[in-house]
Amino acid sequence: SDEALLKISRDGMLALNLEEMTKLQAHANDAEVQQIRAGVGLGSELTDVELEALAQTWSEHCKHKIFSARIEYEDDQGNQEVINSLFKSYIMKVTADVRKARGKDDICLSVFKDNAGVIKFNDDWSLVYKVETHNSPSALDPYGGALTGIVGCNRDPFGTGMGARLMFNTDVFCFASPFYDKPLPPRLLHPRRIFEGVVEGVEHGGNKSGIPTVNGSLVFDDRFAGKPLVYCGT
């Protein structure tokens, strides 16, 4: 039943909605899938490991479902707009427009295709660059969230093309004031704890991988009390 599917999602903390759980159920019940599973010695039901793996790869953190969704937006003036994928409309399109405008002077060699972006540096060398945010993980576990963020940035240039040589890390951090003295909602860590944990996590992640952090920026604004910006790159 629908309730049974939702219970599986809740009990396993899969964070999958009914539509997603129904898709998994239909896949598992497909006759061809059942035959393949039997051929490799798997049972008819999805295992806990399979459910967990699918839930992780379908999570907002990995899949960016909000970025890909159809969004109906209305501003404070009453103007309405339907956006089919924020990512395609406002990130990929802007990049494509800039590349088109530059024409033969476009230096982009690989964009939105591999694990990191690649631009032409000179006739002999290309520059590989990967940046990403790790905001929610760092809000929950500042040290671990920041460390996994920076080593993920280390990992991706390694896996771009035939592999890149890593040179340095960079970062931008935005936090509420470390002297913040207003009430915080339940489960939110104090900005000072987030600040100190994030800085240490990025430092350890880079140094223990042998990749120095050569520059960075700090911004303090109390609007970041709800969620910090932890923006790292390699």
Predicted stretch roles:
Residues S1-T234:
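Core nucleic-acid recognition elements
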